[in-house]
Amino acid sequence: EQHLLDVRDILYIDTVDKRTFLYTGKTVYECALRLYELEDGLQNLDFLRVGRSAIVNFRRIRSIRPELGGRLLLTMENGEQLYVSRQYAVAMKEKLREVERSILK
């Protein structure tokens, strides 16, 4: 069965055992595309890679908390928590600065 989703409804995307899943506020959908294929298509829509196996919708993050070791802990709108690895934390912090600059203009 195929579903048409509005990308704004997606909280995050992750991969488990080479299977890709899209998480909305209420439902989880399996997707035939690989994570890197989705990442390429969603780059300009505020989706950011947060680890080897996950991409988040920046607009659906409720809070961001720094953790030991340079990681970040994200709490999504539905209360689920995801870690941003050190490798991807730099891009997340840059996105935050970009948003702050646009607000202060």
Predicted feature locations:
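C-terminal structural segments of small proteins and small subunits
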Residues: V90-A91
